[in-house]
From Swiss-Prot:
GO terms for molecular function: CCR6 chemokine receptor binding; chemoattractant activity; identical protein binding. Has bactericidal activity. Active against E.coli ML35 but not against S.aureus 502A. May act as a ligand for C-C chemokine receptor CCR6. Positively regulates the sperm motility and bactericidal activity in a CCR6-dependent manner. Binds to CCR6 and triggers Ca2+ mobilization in the sperm which is important for its motility. InterPro entries: Beta/alpha-defensin_C, Defensin_beta-like. This is Beta-defensin 1. Keywords: Antibiotic, Antimicrobial, Defensin, Disulfide bond, Membrane, Secreted. Neutrophilic granules. Disulfide bonds join C5-C34, C12-C27, C17-C35. It is found in: Secreted; Membrane. Monomer. Homodimer. Gene3D superfamilies: Antimicrobial Peptide, Beta-defensin 2, Chain A. The lineage of its organism: Eukaryota, Metazoa, Chordata, Craniata, Vertebrata.
Length: 38
């Protein structure tokens, strides 16, 4: 969720993570990804 995403150093982004980031989870709905830099 949103809180655990931020705890892990990620940010919530719609649809998918950009090329320089990796997905570490989801935020609100499955379409909203939790992304983090490499």
């Amino acid at each position: 969720d949103f809180a655990s995403c931020h705890t892990n150093g990620g940010i919530c982004l719609p649809n998918r993570c950009p090329g320089h980031m990796i997905q570490i989870g989801i935020c609100f709905r499955p379409r909203v990804k939790c992304c983090r830099s490499w």
